[in-house]
Curated annotation (Swiss-Prot):
GO terms, biological process: proteolysis
Gene Ontology molecular functions: ATP binding; ATP hydrolysis activity; ATP-dependent protein folding chaperone; peptidase activity; unfolded protein binding
Protein name listed in UniProt: CLP protease regulatory subunit CLPX3, mitochondrial
Lineage: Eukaryota, Viridiplantae, Streptophyta, Embryophyta, Tracheophyta
Ranges annotated as biased composition (Basic and acidic residues): 634-649
Organism (species): Arabidopsis thaliana
Amino acid sequence: MSGLWRLRNLKSLALHARSISPVSNLYSLELGSCPRRRIQERFKSEQGGGGGGGDDFPVPVTRRKLRAEPNCPRCSKQMDLLFSNRQFPSSNLLQRPDDSDSSGAGDKTNFQSVNFCPTCKTAYGFNPRGVSPLQGTFIEIGRVQSPTTTTTNATTSKSTRKQQQHSKDPNQGFNYRNKLRSSFWDTLRSYGAEPPEDWSPPPPHSPLNSSPPNTIPVNASPSAVDTSPLPDAVNDVSRWGGAGLGRDFPTPKEICKWLDKFVIGQSRAKKVLSVAVYNHYKRIYHTSMKKGSAAQPIDDDDNVELDKSNVLLMGPTGSGKTLLAKTLARLVNVPFVIADATTLTQAGYVGDDVESILHKLLTVAEFNVQAAQQGIVYIDEVDKITKKAESLNISRDVSGEGVQQALLKLLEGTIVNVPGKGARKHPRGDHIQIDTKDILFICGGAFVDLEKTIVDRRQDSSIGFGAPVRANMATSGVTSGAITSSLLESVESADLTAYGLIPEFVGRFPILVSLSALTEDQLIRVLVEPKNALGKQYKKLFSMNNVKLHFTEKALEIISKQAMVKNTGARGLRALLESILTEAMFEIPDDKKGDERIDAVIVDEESTSSEASRGCTAKILRGDGAFERYLSENKSKDATEPMVDERVGSAKAMRL
């Protein structure tokens, strides 16, 4: 009895599937044959019942699912396709146009299957048009832009008129689409899978919509679409720069002027970095133009292959190494990532592999491989991975020399398999191949006591530079910043090798740049002049509560002197300002009116002179007009007030 009942359902299924012709056709599927072990997979009926039910029970609706393994239309990865005879509500979207003329019009059963791709998190509806072999049409759930979907199969004018008759109500297709979505979630929960991500369609002006409506852009993920207005191309993630700027790429002088707006001092380092970045992306641009042209070079000299030149920055902490690299990446608009060399270990040990650096770069590039292959990688604290001194310890140096050896091919240029999910390498995991030959690597480090190695190499401890260095080392143990900077300018590869870097690692950095320690005057300029100056940052922070912030010239001098004593460079300035302004920032958020309202905060000589005792705080002026009264009482020719014009975001200095 059970066999007869199954045979009857199979005949009905084949009869209806043969009579269906798809109206919407986004993606077509044709499977010539399916493995026998995947042909039938039976599930119990949702409504219960059996084959021998009595008259008191309704006829059971049995759902049979046939499993196939086609490729996903979006990501081309393998996915499971479940074909069932679940009955959906009929509509003009999924019902074939000439149902009214077909035999058995009263039984309008649409054989549907709602499927989910686990790789790209995309949901599809499946309309079959043949069972043996299985043929049908994919409909992407949530991406249908109109009640009627474009069809690739030519239809007659008669069927078109009948389709228009089915869609007289303009909201009919939209309402059915919502019903289809709700049915999809019910079916998906029964499969035990997680719902896909909510990917909104790209805006009309987005580059992703430049393709025809029935095509999907390649190498573009919906998460890369930013619907918010962007003021300039620097923050536009949908259009990367680098070699793509072509002849519009800034010249070294233009790059140096841009760096002057953000970094104080370091004129020689700015020139060297400007030339290095310009030559790097000019090489990539001309190489791509050469590959794109079909003409063969006449002279053999045109076939010269240009290698990249990585950069090694050396300088004390707070001198601007990281800021220089970050500002360069922002100017040329390429993906930029900062890696810490102290967290890297050799492959197979606890810690981050060197491939994790490329995965971070790929993440910043929104998984755009072409953009990531022209990015900038800054590896900080590279002086901390020097090899250990030879001793009785025979264990492997996995965080020192082992990391240097692992970085060799990465710096030179090779194809690296990056794990897709950022985990360690797995033989069966998905990998993304990245070519590092066009990635600019900038390494930086403080290289403490490197000047001692330079003095030993020069062998002039009695005269010249060696005499003051030896004298300072003998008396105080610390050399002056000017002498140290002069010695670092004459650094050579042999000095770095003696410091603990292996020769192969040093050879990957033909450009050696030394940065000098900031002077007291330069620290004062750091507080007021750059676009991202600390004084402007705190003034903007206070202005959010309608409170004015004022620095006197004497206070700026005292703050810079205290930062020089700390020997932490520009980083010490923020710590000092936080200590001085903490009490004011604690009181300001309280909403008070009248004489209790905070009108301004003053940082003067008295607020900064006792910083060493941790008892100094900025002066708080309360009441309307308190700031104007303070200015009139303390008017001085030498006092300056750095102010922030919020309308244009530029800095001004107003004489009080």
